[in-house]
């Protein structure tokens, strides 16, 4: 009797997870707005779905809400990505591999990643659609600063670090920090503070991240010569990767 009950419950769970070519990820244990790590659950779900799909078109449905992804339990993949750092394996939040005729519908969900992760990969697949979700990082790998003063004669710029950026001044270097990562930014992109457009005739620029001093809370004085960075300019720092 117990065996029959277990088999019945298993059948119901499978039927709930997959119905008419649609896989509801809640049937794999994924629940929104809990703050819990969704990485191992979605890794297991996508692996199982890829192994058993037998419909012309498959829909994978993620109940609307916020999902947090952490490196622990995430899919590990070896990818070599153009214009990207080449450390491997990479930790992937949603790894879509060897899939065909798949529609992934996040139904308006917010996917928030923590640490150093690759949010989504789509490899060896065809005719796939990923839609209705947003991607963000709890602590982005870029650092935003605003130019306060620019001494073009002395080659010094004073800038203010955005309140959400984690950093420290270590050995006179501006060190951006996050969950499981840190770097001294090497390059940046400059935006006009009022219009948010790229500063005219600029692309990647070198940034003042070395030999700096913190002269007040979140205010940095740096040897940095660039006459185009007028006060109010917003610069987004990034590393090499």
Region roles according to the model:
Residues 5-14:
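Sec-dependent N-terminal signal peptides
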Residues 14-23:
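Bacterial Sec-dependent signal peptides at the C-terminal "C-region" and cleavage site
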Residues 25-60:
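Acidic Gly/Asp/Thr-rich repetitive segments characteristic of extracellular carbohydrate-active
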Residues 43, 47-52, 68-103, 112-131, ...:
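Extracellular beta-strand-rich solenoid/capping regions of secreted or surface-exposed proteins
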Residues 66, 108-110, 134:
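A structural signal for beta-strand register positions
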Residues 145-207:
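Non-catalytic, alpha-helical, charged scaffold/linker segments
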Residues 186-241:
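Long, low-complexity, polar/charged, intrinsically disordered or flexibly structured peripheral segments
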């Amino acid at each position: 009797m117990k065996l029959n009950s277990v088999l019945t419950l298993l059948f119901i769970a499978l039927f709930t997870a997959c119905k008419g070519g649609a896989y509801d990820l809640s049937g794999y244990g994924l629940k929104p707005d809990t703050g819990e790590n969704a990485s191992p659950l979605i890794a297991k779900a996508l692996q199982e779905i890829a192994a058993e799909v037998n419909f012309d078109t498959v829909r994978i449905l993620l109940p609307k809400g916020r999902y947090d992804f952490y490196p622990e339990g995430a899919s590990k993949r070896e990818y070599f990505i153009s214009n990207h750092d080449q450390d491997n394996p990479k930790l992937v939040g949603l790894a879509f591999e060897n899939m065909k005729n798949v529609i992934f519908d996040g139904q308006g969900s917010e996917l928030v990643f923590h640490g150093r992760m690759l949010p989504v990969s789509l490899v060896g697949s065809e005719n796939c659609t990923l839609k209705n979700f947003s991607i963000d990082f709890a602590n982005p790998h870029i650092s935003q600063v605003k130019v306060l003063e620019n001494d073009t004669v002395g080659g010094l710029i004073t800038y203010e670090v955005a309140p959400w950026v984690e950093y420290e001044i270590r050995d006179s270097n501006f060190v951006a920090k996050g969950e499981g990562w840190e770097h001294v930014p090497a390059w940046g992109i400059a935006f006009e503070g009022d219009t948010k457009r790229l500063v005219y005739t600029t692309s990647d620029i070198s940034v003042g991240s070395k030999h700096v001093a913190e002269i007040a809370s979140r205010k940095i004085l740096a040897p940095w010569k660039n006459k185009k960075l007028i006060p109010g300019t917003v610069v987004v720092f990034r590393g090499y990767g």
